[in-house]
Amino acid sequence: MRIGHGFDVHKFGGEGPLVIGGVRIPYTQGLLAHSDGDVVLHAVTDALLGAAALGDIGKLFPDTDPAFKGADSRGLLREAWRRINEKGYQLGNLDVTIIAQAPKMAPHIPQMRVNLAEDLLCHMDDVNVKATTTEQLGFTGRGEGIACEAVALLVKKGTGEIVAW
């Protein structure tokens, strides 16, 4: 078993859509980023890459490469997951925490879980997404941006490490 941790943060700004966990969320602003700024998918990608010892999202998809300008983060996650699968890993489980004062994430979490399970070719029971605030403290509490943390457990395929419930 291998554990990876991912973290991402983006500042609000611009007129682009707000995309979190692959879901377009109605809001007054998007997030400033080279790609679509999806903090959930970026943190998840980093957690998975870290667990597989494949570096990080910036190494795989550098923001200096124009090919990734405005990139759909679901596509980036799928490509990272393909490489992780090639190393013989499958997902044990994934736990995601979104840190945002606004907008409220609860109505969108079920679809985020669906998107992650689809992209990672796993069951929804293997994916947890939750959200919290910082009680109006810090940059997220002031509504300046959104942060996300993710923890992923990978297991080698065929090792019997996965428990079937």
Curated annotation (Swiss-Prot):
It catalyses: 4-CDP-2-C-methyl-D-erythritol 2-phosphate = 2-C-methyl-D-erythritol 2,4-cyclic diphosphate + CMP. Its cofactor is a divalent metal cation. PROSITE patterns: ISPF (PS01350). It comes from the Bacteria. Binds 1 divalent metal cation per subunit. The keyword Metal-binding applies. Gene3D superfamilies: 2-C-methyl-D-erythritol 2,4-cyclodiphosphate synthase. Pfam families: YgbB (PF02542). The keyword Metal-binding applies. GO terms for molecular function: 2-C-methyl-D-erythritol 2,4-cyclodiphosphate synthase activity; metal ion binding. Pathway: Isoprenoid biosynthesis; isopentenyl diphosphate biosynthesis via DXP pathway; isopentenyl diphosphate from 1-deoxy-D-xylulose 5-phosphate: step 4/6. The record marks 34, 133 as: Transition state stabilizer. A divalent metal cation binds at residues 8, 10, 42. Its EC number is 4.6.1.12. InterPro entries: MECDP_synthase (IPR003526), MECDP_synthase_CS (IPR020555), MECDP_synthase_sf (IPR036571). Keywords: Isoprene biosynthesis, Lyase, Metal-binding. 4-CDP-2-C-methyl-D-erythritol 2-phosphate binds at residues 8-10, 34-35, 56-58, 61-65, 100-106, 132-135, 139, 142. GO terms for biological process: isopentenyl diphosphate biosynthetic process, methylerythritol 4-phosphate pathway; terpenoid biosynthetic process. Homotrimer. Involved in the biosynthesis of isopentenyl diphosphate (IPP) and dimethylallyl diphosphate (DMAPP), two major building blocks of isoprenoid compounds. Catalyzes the conversion of 4-diphosphocytidyl-2-C-methyl-D-erythritol 2-phosphate (CDP-ME2P) to 2-C-methyl-D-erythritol 2,4-cyclodiphosphate (ME-CPP) with a corresponding release of cytidine 5-monophosphate (CMP). Belongs to the IspF family. NCBIfam families: ispF. PANTHER family: 2-C-METHYL-D-ERYTHRITOL 2,4-CYCLODIPHOSPHATE SYNTHASE, CHLOROPLASTIC (PTHR43181:SF1). This is 2-C-methyl-D-erythritol 2,4-cyclodiphosphate synthase. The gene is ispF.
